[in-house]
Regions:
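Conserved glycine-rich cofactor-binding loop
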Residues: 10-11
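Conserved glycine-rich Rossmann-like NAD(P)H-binding loop of the short-chain dehydrogenase/reductase
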Residues: 24-41
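Rossmann-fold cofactor-recognition segment
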Residues: 45-60
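Short alpha-helical oligomerization interface
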Residues: 89-102
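Active-site helix of classical SDR
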Residues: 112, 148
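Residue(s) in the substrate-gating loop at a strand-loop-helix junction
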Residues: 132
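C-terminal helical subdomain
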Residues: 174, 187-223
Length: 238
């Protein structure tokens, strides 16, 4: 039986990913802060699954919780690190920004590092990290969020190089979504994609063991433009 852990499974991309992976026969370890949401989701899915609460604000505790879940499941071939927080920063607020750094940087790093170490010990596996197209440009009204996602994408790129040097069958997939219709999105700007469509493309990238994927595919054009256009022009849009 294929087994996967989804960190950040209580809503949005993680929730839909659980639905689609379970339909493919995966036994899942569902992790998020809201235990009630995870339990409800596990009852909706075919088969038996594991539920474990986790809060990436406390990275040390989160590491223990991930390790415990892996032991409970016995063997895990796929770990998806999807947890992340974002907020509009009309006013610079340290409480908001420090939470984003704790979750999106420290928490993400802890989960990804431990997943990689586990896969090295196991002799192979697949780590999927959810970043954002926001990693490719700075946003004046969400500067910390953009900066944390730049870290995530860079970290995963480095992890991919490390996996290659290990000569083990370890795949690192970077997922960079654009606008996806999830609870995190405050409005619905142009090119907002239904979460079902977005996750279908993510699942395809997982199956094909892609190293990097934009979600949806049209966002590759935006990413390229942000590298080509001058900064003064980009600042008119972000």
């Amino acid at each position: 039986m294929k087994r996967a852990i989804i960190i950040g499974a209580s809503s949005g991309i993680g929730y839909e990913l659980a639905i689609q992976l379970a339909a493919l026969g995966y036994q899942l370890g569902l992790m998020a802060r809201r235990e009630a949401c995870l339990t409800e989701l596990s009852h909706l899915l075919p088969g038996d699954h594991f539920v474990q609460t986790i809060d990436l604000i406390d990275a040390d505790a989160a590491r223990t919780q991930l390790a415990d879940l892996i032991v409970q499941m016995g063997d895990v071939e796929l770990i998806v690190v999807n947890s992340g927080v974002g907020a509009s920063e009309k006013q610079l607020d340290w409480n908001i920004e420090s939470e984003m750094i704790d979750v999106n940087v420290r928490g993400f790093t802890a989960m990804s590092m431990d997943a990689m170490n586990y896969f090295v010990q196991r002799g192979g596996g697949h780590l999927v990290g959810v970043s954002s197209v926001a990693a490719h440009f700075s946003g004046g009204l969400a500067l910390t969020y953009h900066a944390t996602k730049a870290f995530v994408s860079s970290y995963l790129n480095g992890m991919r190089s490390r996996a290659a040097r290990s000569r083990l069958p370890i795949t690192i997939t970077t997922v960079e979504p654009g606008f996806i219709d999830t609870p995190m999105l405050e409005t619905k700007p142009m090119w907002t994609a239904p979460v079902e469509k977005a996750v279908t493309q993510i699942v395809k990238a997982i199956i094909n063991k892609k190293g990097h994927v934009y979600i949806t595919k049209r966002w590759v054009v935006v990413a390229i433009l942000f590298y080509i256009l001058p900064n003064w022009l980009i600042r008119k849009f972000v």
